[in-house]
């Protein structure tokens, strides 16, 4: 959870994307949200929030999940009066910016509790920290998920299950790893964790294997269980690694004595990843 407090920087994020005319926004033209010290105001964006600025220390906030922020005044009627402008909050996501003026009210029933950022409240913004938006990752992943398998010889058999690599695609700074599992038992697989690791190749039983766990940038399917079939696409940052290491996708079960199945991918398969045609994003 990220928390902001005592952010005194003036919230002037007036840089528009290339080709747009310069523009200014004043508080009079800004949407206002009424806030109260006993009410949490929750603002939800349509995509991950990358930056938040609260222009004064009169309001505090935090970010419990990646697309949601919470705001609340620090003081009540002893300090604030109805109609006081407490702060301006600036919210920057992957592709747009939004600003709200926060107005104090002493009446809890007037305070905004839940606010969704509407389309007409967004100003397009080319965030330099984001090379690919989550929405675009999802579009690529869905297209890859529906595409035929190009790999036939990378698979693992364990616990009467087969885990196989279907595709590896390279898009910008990311690898898209498409894999599936066939469950030939009658026992449902309740997913505990899906992990991506960089492991040393095992050379002997006495060799100590070093493992580096990688955090996926995006996972297409968040299902918690499957019965006979499972397919998913995960996105990881592009990387290079020596031939004595392998990339491993591991799926484990929730039960204490649960099943675990993993798939090892050689470096040669990773570096031969096909480039995914962006035109496919917009095909229907």
In which residue ranges do the predicted regions lie?
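Bacterial Sec-dependent N-terminal signal peptides
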Residues: 1-27
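A general "mature secreted/periplasmic domain" signal
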Residues: 22-284
């Amino acid at each position: 959870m990220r928390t902001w407090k005592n952010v005194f920087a003036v919230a002037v994020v007036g840089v528009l994307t290339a080709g747009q005319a310069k523009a200014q926004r004043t508080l009079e033209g800004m949407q206002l949200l009424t806030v109260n010290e006993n009410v949490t105001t929750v603002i939800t964006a349509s995509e991950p929030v990358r930056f938040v600025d609260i222009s004064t220390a009169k309001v505090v906030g935090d970010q419990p999940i990646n697309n949601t922020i919470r705001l609340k005044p620090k003081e009540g009627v002893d300090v604030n009066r109805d109609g006081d402008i407490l702060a301006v909050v600036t919210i920057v996501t992957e592709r747009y910016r939004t600003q709200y003026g926060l107005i104090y009210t002493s009446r809890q029933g007037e305070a905004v509790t839940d606010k969704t950022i509407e389309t007409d409240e967004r100003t397009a913004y080319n965030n330099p920290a984001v090379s690919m938006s989550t929405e675009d990752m999802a579009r690529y992943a869905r297209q890859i998920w529906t595409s035929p398998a190009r790999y036939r010889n990378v698979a693992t058999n364990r616990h009467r299950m087969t885990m196989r690599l279907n595709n590896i695609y390279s898009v910008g700074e990311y690898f898209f790893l498409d894999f599936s599992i066939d469950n030939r038992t009658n026992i449902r697989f309740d997913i505990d964790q899906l992990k991506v690791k960089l492991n040393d190749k095992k050379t002997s039983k006495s060799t100590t294997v070093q493992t580096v766990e990688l955090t996926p940038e995006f996972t297409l399917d968040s299902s918690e269980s499957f019965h006979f079939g499972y397919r998913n696409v995960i996105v990881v940052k592009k990387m290079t690694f020596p031939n004595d290491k392998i990339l491993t996708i591991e799926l484990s079960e929730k039960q204490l004595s649960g099943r675990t199945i993993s798939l090892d991918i050689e470096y040669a398969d990773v570096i031969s990843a096909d480039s995914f045609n962006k035109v496919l994003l917009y095909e229907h």
